[in-house]
Amino acid sequence: MKIIVLGCGLVGGVIAKDLAADGNLEVTVADRSREAIDRVLRQAPVRGEIVDFSKPGAVRDAVSDFDMAVGAVPGFLGYNMLKEVIEAGKNIVDISFAPEDSMQLDSLAKQKEVTVLVDCGVAPGMSNILAGYAASLMDEAESCEILVGGLPVERYWPYEYRIVFSPLDTIDEYIRPARVMENGRIVEKEALSEVELVDFPGIGTLEAFNTDGLRTLLKTMKIPNMKEKTLRYPGHAEKMRMLRETGFFGSEPVEVGGVKVRPIDLTARLLFPMWKLKEGEKEFTVMRVTVKGKKDGREIKYTYNLVDYFDERTNTTSMARTTGFTCSIMARLVAKGQFTHKGVCPPEFVGQNHEVFKILLEELRKRGVIYKETIS
């Protein structure tokens, strides 16, 4: 079985290495950066191809000789990548988090009879899978709350935050209206709104605020009340609101000293050195998914907790582990014919397949990514 991983950045590299550990899979990584490809080649028995994903037809040509693909490209390239992979008639598991609605490609995917598993990371991804699983065990699911964040272990003033990707992606989370489900209706709320403090054993108190992370859950799950909130150290949301309301996240150019500049570009340029995760710096991922409902006439609640830390042995960030392993495990199951949903498949459908769900959780556990279930 020949698999091509499209994009070999931080997460794509982890996916490729995990897939390559399976002796039955022949793995190739593709990226526009020779440096990124060489970094993965030094760490795993894979092949490399230079591909410029922005060129029309490049993805279609790249996947033509492979049995399936994995998508790990930047979000702005994600939708076109999916489209070209589907046009080539290949299965794909994707983490690219494209802003467009991937369900628009469902008819094409069904026509081509391919499996297209999208948003298959940690959040979206495992958050949806856990929600889908818990809801499927109930006679009636009434609410779903997803709390998730990636944070540095050491807190450095003023932002107490670190990233491993472009700050523009994070800023987008802070300006895009958050869609939540309230009493069966989709309601838009300001990002960074409704801040609340939440305690996590072993970590302490974090703050949670509204972000637009429900995505496909808003359409696929018949749960009348759903929300997704991002977790940060307390005080972060207020700082971000101050920047946003002052105009630092604005996309309309302003003239300064005779030069026009977009405030958001300047802000990202200034924040990146302060936010960038340093080499070897410890970080962790924390997530809590809570689904409440009724079973046999009684109230029931399923809670899933994850706390995952930087892996010092492999020098792998928690965000790359929790995102990449979910994707690589599901890619392996698709490759082996154990998950065969045709068309565009949001991750919550994985949770509704109890056999696949249990395999996924067990494989994650083997890699040290453990979701603790509590039923009450």
Residue ranges and their predicted role:
Residues 3-7:
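Conserved N-terminal Rossmann-fold NAD(P)-binding element of oxidoreductases
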Residues 68-85, 98-102:
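Beta-loop-alpha module in the N-terminal Rossmann-like domain of NAD(P)-dependent dehydrogenases
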Residues 33-36, 99:
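Helix N-cap at the beta1-alpha1 junction of Rossmann-like dinucleotide-binding domains, i.e.
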Residues 63, 67-72, 92-94:
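N-terminal Rossmann-like NAD(P) cofactor-binding module of classical short-chain dehydrogenase/reductase
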Residues 12-13:
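N-terminal Rossmann-fold NAD(P) dinucleotide-binding loop
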Residues 95-118:
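Rossmann-fold NAD(P)-binding glycine/threonine-rich loop
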Residues 52-65:
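Conserved Rossmann-fold cofactor-binding substructure of NAD(P)-dependent oxidoreductases
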Residues 137-376:
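C-terminal catalytic/substrate-binding lobe primarily of soluble NAD(P)-dependent oxidoreductases
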